[in-house]
Amino acid sequence: MAHWVKGNPVDISNGVHVVEFWATWCPPCRTSIPHLTQIQQQYKDRGVNIIGISNEDLGTVEPFVTRMGSKMNYTVAIDEGRSTSKGYMGKYGVNGIPHAFVVKDGAVVWHGHPMAKLEAAIDDALK
């Protein structure tokens, strides 16, 4: 990651994490932000981290995250050069955003729209 805009760097090689690709200009992405904040709150005591990743520049993402405040209460990072995005989205043939990946111990165990069955996928990964 080029920049960790909100929160500390996360090591996804251990535990359960949600890696979600989004953009400030994307209305469905903005709609899913409060839902992801709710999920982060719901699962934080079980060690789950939500990581929102954008490939936009710091000058675009940072003010957006600041304006969102507590409505966007999870880790946010910038993927300059799209290497992380290509590693996830490209591998699974996904082009559209928002798109979330549930990662358990470094391996993707589910992927889909963050508003569709994400909680069930997290619950399964935590078993």
Predicted regions and their residues:
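Short pre-active-site segment immediately N-terminal to redox-active cysteine/selenocysteine motifs
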Residues: 14-17, 22-25, 57, 96
